[in-house]
A protein has these predicted regions:
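A detector of single, family-specific signature residues
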Residues: 1-206
Length: 206
């Protein structure tokens, strides 16, 4: 439940940041992408001596700034509880060792699939999440189609983001991930990421 709540709050925070940036951009006030840019814009709004922001406009964006602050606090509180639970859970600690998963991903996987015995195999677990190709039968032959995208969307996103993170590391440090580097040399980035997802799901199941 708390993972879903965190996910909702993060989406709300993203919407608030976009609105906050858009309001200020209309006045010619822009900053770099990422948290550093948002922090810079918040400082401008908080500084009543900054003449770039008219008084009336400041009153409006202060509301958005307050909303951002509240969302950050709520998200931080949830993440603190998640990390506390993770420290006392050996299973999620093992899952965290899977490259690209992290604490949030590990605890979400353990919380959502608390009883792995309901799955006959790692492939069944991957299929439950929606990470295995659809199988179509044509003329008596089995053909693998695209990823089904059925199942648990939240967990599927965790594995996809994790795979992308690992591939980016491989691009930055090819010598550390030789087999991924070879795959990336032969296949498009997204194709390799999708191919990794079921493998990571099987590792989590194990």
């Amino acid at each position: 439940m708390q993972h879903r709540t965190r996910d909702l709050l993060i989406r709300q925070r993203t919407q608030s940041i976009n609105a906050f940036r858009a309001h200020l951009a209309e006045l010619g006030i822009v900053a770099a992408q990422g948290d550093a840019g948002v922090t810079e814009l918040l400082a401008i709004v908080a500084d009543e001596q900054d003449t770039r922001l008219p008084i009336d406009a400041r009153a409006s964006v202060i509301v958005l700034a307050a909303q951002l602050g509240a969302l950050r606090t709520l998200i931080g509180s949830i993440e603190k509880r998640i990390k506390t639970q993770h420290r006392s859970n050996e299973v999620s600690q093992r899952v965290e060792t899977i490259p690209g998963i992290g604490i949030i991903g590990a605890t979400a996987i353990v919380a959502t699939a608390a009883d792995p015995t309901v799955f006959r195999s790692g492939r069944d677990f991957a299929a439950w999440i929606g990470l295995v190709p659809r199988q179509d039968s044509t003329g008596g032959k089995q053909k693998l189609g695209p990823i089904s995208k059925q199942g648990d969307r939240y967990l599927r996103r965790i594995f996809v983001v994790g795979a992308i993170a690992v591939l980016r590391r491989a691009q930055e440090n090819p010598g550390k991930y030789p087999w991924l580097t070879q795959l990336l040399a032969r296949r498009p980035f997204k194709v390799v990421a999708v191919a990794l997802d079921p493998d990571y799901a099987r590792l989590a199941y194990a």
